[in-house]
């Protein structure tokens, strides 16, 4: 980083820290809000688990968010310091500066934002700009957004800008703020019909129609499947979305459809077939009971600001996951990543259903304190894709790629998850949760490989190549709270599979003191392939809005996932320190 940039960041950092005093002295109708977060690791080499290198002896991700708000205007900025980022964050993350800054003005039915904006149209099929720090996702647009609410029940949004791509220092980019080479623009209209009907309001009905359009501009470039010809690439690619949501009492129904024009890219192998996505969701909820059923079909819906992009950065859209995000360690060992459309997986059919029921207290099943059950099932399968004839180079580049009947299912299961969870409070101080899960996980599709039994070092020698890992998982969690100031929690988990690395066992013990301090000891053990322990000791303390955590131990290599988006995180070992504060 240049000396000039260090000086500018230092001045801005000091100036931002002085804002509280300035606001307090002003005494006007201006308020300051902010938060600071820093995650650091002093890494140690451990070749046994694959922790063979870090970005430096001390690696950290630090963020400072500040916003000043008055009655009509809000201004904010975020300082990021990621010069030596944590394991799992690629080189594009390395850097520091103020990549996020904005000013928003509101008056009556109009709102305008200049700077970096985050937003989402509908379910995100064609547009979602958001931040997820643990995943390393920040695809905000630097540009402008306008929101109009001219009449009750009507909201119109229009926005445009260049998409963020983290940091990239160079001769022509001294500040390191890197953005897409093209631009993204779009509009979203929502009509809440219930706001116009007194009958619907009195009956408790809510009916909403939505429509969106997004277009990206990506400058032309030379991509040649062979020396004989180059691809004629569209510089403007449009996508549209329509949706209807209906609510009545505990009922909630959603139907949504999106269409994307032909968008040849590195993701889809530079084919010209349009993309589409359709979703149906029905849910019901009342006290003590709820259920949810969902179905989604999507194909060729990778939509990036740069057609040659890769990894999890640069997406304009977000395809919502139909697999549950598990919090237990072994249940989350094989997380599913949504398939946007690649030559290996052109799309997916996804189904999810869930039912919850709580037996009332003082009933045969409920007992003295009540009993809760939750049954959840997810099934995701590929779409049927019939390849077209290849071009003169023997590939599908420059063609429509394939045909696919809408209701056609492919030959491969991508993911299956069925689990039953039981929760019961046994006494005033003691409660338990038990869970059983059966899971099928297609490693060849999700991770790009299957584990080959013929390779040296794998525990199941002699068996066939395993693209799908079949797992049986059992979990028991116990909670004991003998007093107001003391609480204890323990977990015992077991995962059985004959594929991948074989069986795993996980145990955790946690004690909380005075609702402020917590000490945790855990160990993850692989009983077959590696026979390695991944131990960890952690302590945390909360004081007001301050939180600090210190831990030491091993972390296995694996995938960190949220909402169907996954990032590979390599193995690590060392002393980790996290601190956060809000004000």
Regions found by a protein language model. Give the residues of each.
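Short helix/strand-bridging catalytic loops that position acidic/His residues to coordinate divalent metals
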Residues: 128-132, 172-174, 267-270, 277
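Bacterial N-terminal signal peptides that target proteins for export
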Residues: 2-9
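Exposed, low-structure sequence patches enriched in small/polar residues
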Residues: 37, 59, 197-204, 209-213, ...
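A short secondary-structure junction signal
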Residues: 125-126, 168-172, 221-225, 256
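Short acidic/His/Gly/Ser-rich catalytic and metal-binding motifs that mark active-site loops
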Residues: 43, 121-124, 166-167, 219-222, ...
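Bacterial N-terminal signal peptides
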Residues: 10-20
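Flexible, glycine/proline-enriched loop segments at strand-loop-helix junctions
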Residues: 131-134, 171-179, 230-231
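Beta-barrel outer-membrane channel/assembly domains of diderm bacteria
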Residues: 23-119, 125-127, 140-160, 180-198, ...
């Amino acid at each position: 980083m240049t000396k000039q940039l260090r000086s500018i960041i230092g001045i801005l950092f000091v100036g931002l820290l002085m804002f509280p005093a300035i606001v307090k002295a002003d005494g006007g109708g201006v308020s300051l809000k902010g938060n600071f977060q820093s995650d650091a690791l002093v890494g140690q080499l451990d070749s046994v688990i694959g922790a063979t290198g870090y970005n430096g002896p001390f690696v950290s991700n630090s963020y400072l968010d500040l916003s000043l708000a008055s009655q009509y205007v809000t201004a904010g900025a975020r300082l990021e310091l990621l010069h030596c980022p944590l394991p799992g964050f690629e080189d594009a993350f390395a850097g520091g500066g103020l990549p996020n800054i904005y000013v928003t003005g509101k008056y009556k039915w109009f709102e305008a934002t200049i700077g970096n904006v985050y937003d989402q149209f509908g379910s995100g099929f064609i547009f979602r700009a958001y931040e997820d720090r643990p995943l390393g996702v920040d695809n905000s647009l630097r540009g402008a957004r306008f929101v109009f609410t001219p009449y009750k029940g009507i909201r119109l949004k229009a926005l445009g800008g260049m998409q963020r791509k983290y940091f990239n220092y160079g001769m022509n980019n001294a500040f390191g703020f890197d953005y897409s080479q093209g631009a993204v623009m779009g509009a979203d209209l929502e009509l809440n019909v219930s706001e116009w009907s007194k009958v619907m309001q009195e009956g408790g009905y809510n009916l909403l129609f939505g429509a969106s359009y997004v277009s990206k501009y990506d400058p032309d470039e030379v991509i040649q499947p062979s020396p004989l010809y180059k691809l004629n690439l569209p510089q403007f690619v449009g996508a549209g979305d329509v949706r209807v949501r209906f609510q009545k009492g505990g009922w909630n129904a959603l139907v949504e459809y999106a269409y994307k024009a032909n968008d040849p890219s590195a993701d889809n192998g530079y084919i010209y077939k349009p993309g589409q996505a359709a979703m149906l969701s029905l849910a019901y909820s009342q006290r003590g009971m709820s259920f949810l059923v969902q179905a989604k079909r999507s194909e060729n819906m990778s939509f990036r600001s740069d057609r040659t992009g890769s990894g999890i950065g640069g997406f304009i859209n977000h395809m919502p996951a139909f697999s549950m995000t598990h919090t237990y360690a072994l249940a989350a060992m094989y997380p599913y990543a949504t398939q946007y459309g690649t030559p290996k997986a052109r799309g997916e059919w996804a189904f999810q259903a869930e039912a919850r029921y709580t037996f009332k207290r003082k009933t045969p099943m409920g007992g003295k304190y009540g009993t809760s059950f939750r049954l959840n099932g997810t099934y995701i399968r590929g779409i049927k894709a019939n390849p077209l004839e290849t071009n003169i180079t023997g590939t599908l580049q420059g063609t429509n790629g394939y045909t696919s009947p809408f209701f056609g299912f492919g030959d491969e299961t991508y993911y299956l998850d069925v689990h039953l969870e039981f929760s019961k409070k046994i006494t005033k101080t003691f409660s338990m949760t038990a869970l059983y899960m059966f899971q099928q996980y297609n490693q060849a599709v999700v991770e790009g490989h299957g584990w080959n039994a013929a390779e040296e070092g794998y525990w199941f020698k002699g068996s066939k190549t395993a693209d799908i890992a079949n797992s049986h998982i059992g979990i028991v969690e116990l909670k004991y709270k003998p007093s107001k100031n003391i609480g204890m929690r323990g977990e015992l988990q077991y995962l059985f599979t004959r594929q991948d690395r074989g069986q795993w066992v996980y145990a955790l013990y946690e004690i909380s003191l005075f609702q402020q301090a917590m000490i945790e000891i855990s160990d993850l053990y692989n009983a077959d392939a590696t026979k390695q322990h991944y131990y960890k000791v952690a302590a945390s303390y909360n004081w007001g809005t301050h939180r600090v955590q210190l831990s030491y131990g091993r972390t296995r290599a694996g995938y960190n996932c949220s909402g169907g988006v996954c990032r590979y995180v390599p193995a690590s070992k060392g002393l980790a320190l996290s601190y956060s504060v809000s004000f």
